């Protein structure tokens, strides 16, 4: 089936209204893309990340009356006149197969792999997580997830108790369990994350408990991993302290490299010893130890 793509770049204030307008004129799908290849602005907890200049893309059947669609869009969103919309014809091909072909097994460290379900495992003797790429939650492709997975491979949590705080897809909890952790729990504020994490755990025969934050309970653990954003990482410091044993390890990621120094200083003020910083692209992962208080 052939498709027509209509796109334009708008401010963050217009991105959601334009998405709604696309759906009102019967777009088959609407997606957002970063128009400037910039880091995501950090949102408040519970809000959707969006870029200052966002490319909004609507997909339409090739039989659609595209000029009429654009005129309708211009009427619905007067701040975006008809001449600002770009039209692109997409070739007729198996888009599901094309999407699947983008993803190949990914290696983290020396023995940890994430393998899409339609791919063969490159190394059957390695630690292989069967995980399909998704639109909503991290499955290894983002630098912050990659940094945490590499850290786990290099520092296997053998016989340790672990919490994955802000679990998303559950990939970090899965990696910890498969790398020898004694007991692993995961939590997130998003119900869809809990569902996705549990499905991924079941697919990998992993015994992991996932709960919403408001329902989450745990004894203090040996290792806590939080791959979220810098603002929530600060706000959650008291909760992390409560959930960690003395001398436990804390792994923080989800922050931009230019936010690292401030977060390091903040956690040192909370009584943590800073151990190391690892960077990838514009993102960072930080390691701390919870110091014993006298």
Swiss-Prot record:
It comes from Hydrogenovibrio crunogenus (strain DSM 25203 / XCL-2). The lineage of its organism: Bacteria, Pseudomonadati, Pseudomonadota, Gammaproteobacteria, Thiotrichales. Belongs to the methyltransferase superfamily. PrmA family. Its main location: cytoplasm. PANTHER family: ELECTRON TRANSFER FLAVOPROTEIN BETA SUBUNIT LYSINE METHYLTRANSFERASE (PTHR43648:SF1). This is Ribosomal protein L11 methyltransferase. InterPro entries: Ribosomal_L11_MeTrfase_PrmA, Ribosomal_PrmA_MeTrfase, SAM-dependent_MTases_sf. Disulfide bonds: none annotated. One of its GO terms (biological process) is methylation.
């Amino acid at each position: 089936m052939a498709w027509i793509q209509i796109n334009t770049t708008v401010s963050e204030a217009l991105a959601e209204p334009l998405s709604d307008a696309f759906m009102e004129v019967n777009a088959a799908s609407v997606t957002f893309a970063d128009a400037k290849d910039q880091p995501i602005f950090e949102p408040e907890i519970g809000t959707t990340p969006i870029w200052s200049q966002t490319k909004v893309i609507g997909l339409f059947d090739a039989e659609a009356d595209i000029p009429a669609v654009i005129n309708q869009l211009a009427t619905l969103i007067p701040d975006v006149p008809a001449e600002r919309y770009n039209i692109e014809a997409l070739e007729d091909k198996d888009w599901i197969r094309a999407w699947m072909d983008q993803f190949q097994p990914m290696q983290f460290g020396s023995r940890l792999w994430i393998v899409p379900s339609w791919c063969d495992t490159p190394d059957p003797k390695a630690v292989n997580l069967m995980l399909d790429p998704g639109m909503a939650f991290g499955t290894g492709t983002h630098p912050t997830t990659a940094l945490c997975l590499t850290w786990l491979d290099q520092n296997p949590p053998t016989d340790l108790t672990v919490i994955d705080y802000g679990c998303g897809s559950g990939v970090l909890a899965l990696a910890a369990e498969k790398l020898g952790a004694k007991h692993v729990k995961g939590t997130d504020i998003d119900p869809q994350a809990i569902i996705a994490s549990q499905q991924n755990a079941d697919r990998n025969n992993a015994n992991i408990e996932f709960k919403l934050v408001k329902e989450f309970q745990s004894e203090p653990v040996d290792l806590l991993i939080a791959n979220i954003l810098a603002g929530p990482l600060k706000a959650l410091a008291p909760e992390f302290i409560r959930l960690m044993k003395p001398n436990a390890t804390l792994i923080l990621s989800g922050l931009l490299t230019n936010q690292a120094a401030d977060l390091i200083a903040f956690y040192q003020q909370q009584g943590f010893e800073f151990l190391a910083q690892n960077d990838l692209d514009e993102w960072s992962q930080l390691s701390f130890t919870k110091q014993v208080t006298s």
